[in-house]
């Protein structure tokens, strides 16, 4: 299908999408969380031409048994990656089921400042009841209750990002004033499990509002910039994208590619001996690089981008960099991000006006 060029995102948490991916990694297990490892994966993805990197997270181990994966917090890793990259966007997963929106807004606004406007946020949720005890909070039980927490949390975070107008920081030596207090605004929100009073403690992010990504099944589409849509086939993805109601849509695609040493099927079978690759209802390509390029070509016009979940980063990322992305760029099926641009610009999203400044301008115009 023809359509605008795709934007490409890559999930880089752990050693890959498969829970036993570490068994085929080229590094020793104790190097997974090393600064060199984190920086090298990010650099390889940026050099390949990905527009966005995402980093999964959670307060509990993702599984039990011998294939439990350790991780450093996604926001901390994202901040580290921001300092060692210059073009690619970075979006950590931050669940809102139990986290305080005030602290989430501060962390993510800080990330946007550190990255000079390249930050995003993948909204997620904590589904396991054990997570509540980590936060010292009552269990949020049921999908509807978790959705309310996410929806209310996103609303508050967005309002906090706007609680500082763009020119609130004046740094006037002549008047000894650092802030224009009239351009700071009081947020007054009362939810079921928390309240937020007052402005943020971090100035408005460079992008105004970070790019917010998430599943429209969990967060209302009008609160998202990018819907992450799933489906086991092209028809299902098309239906999900059409129903998302968001400015942009990205298809979720799990990937296992043929390599010089083994076919994709052999690689998957090797890992399946240790743990199953869970079915998350996503498109899944197991096969050649050419086949993946063809699939992504079919997604043009259906979605605005794709987020790839490689089976094993150390094996699949080199194949993506060498055999998949170059022909996509050559045919203009996908585009590289441009130096000096924000993540919103890369995704074709306008920088939003500050809600308080816009309201004041409307009042003055009357």
Q: Where are the predicted features?
A:
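N-terminal beta1-alpha1-beta2 module of alpha/beta enzyme domains
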Residues: 1-84, 209-210, 224-226, 341, ...
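Acidic (Asp/Glu)-rich catalytic clusters
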Residues: 2, 43-47, 78-86, 112-116, ...
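N-terminal small/glycine-rich loop or linker at the start of catalytic domains
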Residues: 2-30, 129-134, 183, 188-215, ...
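Hydrophobic faces of well-ordered beta-strands that scaffold small-molecule active sites
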Residues: 6-12, 53-55, 88-94, 117-124, ...
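Flexible, glycine-rich active-site loops centered on histidine and acidic residues
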Residues: 11-31, 100-183, 236
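Conserved, mostly hydrophobic/aromatic
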Residues: 45, 49, 81, 111, ...
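Glycine-rich, proline-tolerant flexible connector loops at the mouths of alpha/beta enzymes
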Residues: 52-72, 231-236, 308-321
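C-terminal helical cap(s) of enzyme catalytic domains, especially alpha/beta-barrels
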Residues: 133-144, 152-159, 237-244, 313-337
């Amino acid at each position: 299908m023809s359509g605008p060029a795709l934007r490409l995102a890559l999930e880089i948490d752990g050693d890959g999408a498969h829970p036993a991916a570490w068994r085929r990694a080229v590094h020793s297990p104790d190097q997974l969380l090393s600064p060199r490892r984190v920086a090298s994966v990010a650099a390889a993805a940026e050099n390949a031409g990905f527009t966005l990197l995402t980093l999964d997270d959670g307060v509990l181990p993702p599984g039990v048994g011998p294939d439990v994966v350790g991780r450093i917090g996604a926001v901390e890793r994202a901040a580290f990656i921001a300092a060692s990259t210059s073009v690619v966007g970075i979006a950590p997963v931050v669940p809102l089921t139990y986290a305080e929106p005030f602290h989430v807004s501060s962390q993510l606004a800080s990330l946007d400042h550190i990255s000079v406007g390249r930050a995003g946020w993948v909204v997620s949720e904590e589904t396991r009841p054990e997570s509540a005890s980590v936060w010292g909070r009552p269990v949020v039980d049921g999908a509807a209750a978790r959705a309310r927490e996410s929806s209310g949390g996103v609303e508050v975070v967005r309002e906090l990002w706007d609680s500082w107008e763009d020119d609130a920081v004046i740094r006037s030596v002549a008047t000894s004033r650092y802030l224009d207090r009239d351009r700071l605004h009081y947020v007054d929100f009362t939810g079921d499990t928390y309240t937020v009073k007052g402005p943020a403690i971090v100035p408005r992010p460079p992008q105004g509002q970070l790019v917010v990504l998430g599943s429209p099944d969990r967060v209302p589409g009008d609160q998202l910039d990018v819907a992450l849509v799933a489906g086991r086939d092209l028809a299902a993805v098309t239906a999900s994208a059409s129903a998302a109601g968001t400015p942009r849509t990205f298809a979720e695609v799990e990937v296992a590619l043929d390599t010089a040493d083994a076919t994709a099927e052999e690689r998957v079978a090797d890992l399946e001996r240790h743990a199953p690759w869970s079915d998350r209802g996503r498109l899944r390509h197991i096969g050649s690089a050419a086949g993946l390029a063809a699939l992504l070509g079919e997604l043009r016009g259906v979605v605005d981008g794709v987020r790839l979940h490689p089976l094993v980063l150390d094996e699949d990322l080199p194949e993506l960099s060498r055999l998949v992305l170059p022909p996509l760029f050559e045919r203009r099926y996908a585009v590289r991000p441009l130096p000096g641009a924000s993540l919103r610009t890369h995704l074709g999203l306008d920088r939003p006006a500050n809600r308080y400044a816009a309201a004041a301008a409307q009042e003055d115009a009357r």
